[in-house]
């Protein structure tokens, strides 16, 4: 599993509570926050540590060290939700069935960062959460599941939170179907 912000937590929790084994969590390193500039682990790192899942914190998936850790767990499938970086081709090939990604937009319209904010800013009436087979490139690959979401008066944060909650079961459905 690869993810960093709070939006990735519902999917991590759902996978951990399911019949699927989460063998490694990859996330960004602790970040400084607040007036005291205290280092805080990512929300994903906190949840994984409490669940007893091995955590690898890295700013890049291109290093040999992180590649070795991913290869060592011999995962069947990788799941990505808002990790915050591109996955290099060598790492994409490590899990037996590759990687799936939950993206909070109607692909391919809003590939990349801040898709919910862009959909709202551009006045879209709807968006979608998409689970897709991750390929080399930015948010590219065959879409396995698309769930349309109406954009109302909620803030981008509220809409993202709702999509993150709903997206967790969407990911589980796709992962179950790939077995």
Task: Cite the ranges covered by each PLM segment.
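N-terminal Rossmann-like dinucleotide-binding module
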Residues: 1-35
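Hydrophobic N-terminal alpha-helices or hydrophobic patches in metabolic proteins across all domains
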Residues: 2-16, 49-53, 74-76, 166-168
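Amphipathic, non-transmembrane alpha-helical secondary structure
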Residues: 9, 13-17, 67-71, 89, ...
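Structural motif corresponding to alpha-helix initiation and N-cap regions
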Residues: 9, 38-41, 63-67, 85, ...
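Internal alpha/beta domain cores that form substrate/cofactor-binding pockets in large enzymes
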Residues: 21-25, 54-73, 78, 85-104
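N-terminal beta-loop-helix "entrance" segment that forms/cooperates
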Residues: 31-51
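A generic structural signal for well-ordered alpha-helical segments
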Residues: 48-51, 70, 124
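Donor/substrate-binding cores of folate-linked one-carbon enzymes
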Residues: 77-179
